[in-house]
């Protein structure tokens, strides 16, 4: 409803009542004319004419709707194809390829070299060539060159690398914007993930080294989203068996992320731990190192705590080791390189705690002796 329309209607009705005595005769004549017109409009010929007219209007509307829908569909397909191309200035560069290939003559190797200089990543190049081949106005000779070029690129590229790069591209673009990173870097990380044979701790550590510890949680979200998208793709990069193994690895990585958050947040919730070292990255590094080298716990702790330990009492040392023992015990044993390593780590920590406790008792005795 338009604001003020109610008052406008009321005002019109008031005016109508004020002038009704002047228009009585005209109203009667008009009413008779309307009755006559209605009679003519209700005749069979008029009804047929109105039906034909309404049918023509409906047909025109439907045709306009179909044309708009087809146009939007084509525009959407074009947009979607180039959205998955992560190279900057994809559309102008694609037109440049078309211009180069439209010039008659030249060897396929020359076209391939120039195309790769514009789109170094094979997934980008394949997407661009496929999109160009969808054009209906191509000369036959140009179409054949594009087909040969596409076939050559596909044959020379590892299928898993090619398909994974295509299937994760939209996720890479989305997360790249979120993380203020080049999407091509994220695409490379997904490719590495599906082909890596490294332990999950090494993969997680590599992400931290590449993106910074602040981004580690979101990077794992990207890998998970890309993997699920890849699984659902029409042309998936891996077999069902391979995807099953990757999903198990993803579960381990998510478990590692949860353990990481619990480990770091618990330790930093204690003031005496912050007194040792208040940096989240330091405790994260310690946990990842313990999963790989639990036998080095003594030296690893010394690296993290450093000279700050000299400023604290034996009681604070013992309290810290008790808390540290509990957070290490909470780490799932499956995250260690060898599951039995966790028990060996806990044994070492119990021994260190016993020593700290003995020092604490000795310190208390000395204090009592001084007071007495």
UniProtKB/Swiss-Prot annotation:
Give the residue spans that cross the bilayer: none
Q: Which GO terms describe its biological process?
A: negative regulation of protein secretion; protein secretion by the type III secretion system
Instruction: Tell where it localizes.
Output: Cell membrane
Q: What spans are recorded as compositionally biased (Polar residues)?
A: 1-19
Q: Does the keyword Cell membrane apply?
A: yes
Q: Quick one: where is this thing mainly located?
A: membrane
Q: What does this protein do?
A: Involved in the triggering of intracellular events that lead to microbial internalization. These events include increase in calcium level, redistribution of actin microfilaments, and changes in the normal structure of the microvilli. Encoded within the type III secretion system (SPI-1 T3SS), it is essential for the translocation of protein effectors into host cells. Forms a complex with SipB and SipC in the presence of their chaperone SicA. Positively regulates the secretion of SPI-1 T3SS effector proteins SipB, SipC and SipD and negatively influences the secretion of SipA, SopA and SptP.
What is the protein's given name? Invasion protein InvE
Source organism of this protein record: Salmonella typhimurium (strain LT2 / SGSC1412 / ATCC 700720)
